[in-house]
Amino acid sequence: MIVLAWNCRGLGLDSTVGELRDLIRYHNPAVVFLSEMKKKARAMEKLKWSLGFRCGVAVDCRGKSGGLAMWWRDHLQ
């Protein structure tokens, strides 16, 4: 099982989201863990679905720091 963990230091730029998309496409992880997203959990829900993950949890950032997300493929349930 492949797990991708990344301290992305913010997902506000399209280029950073593109990098994440490329990493997921290349490695095809079963689980993705993101730290320092600097985004609200609600905003991460749309990205999670667009990247092919249906399951996951997220913790809101506080101001412009923090934020965590863990996504997994639905076959892991």
Where are these regions (language model features)?
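Short phosphate/oxyanion-binding micro-motifs
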Residues: 1-77
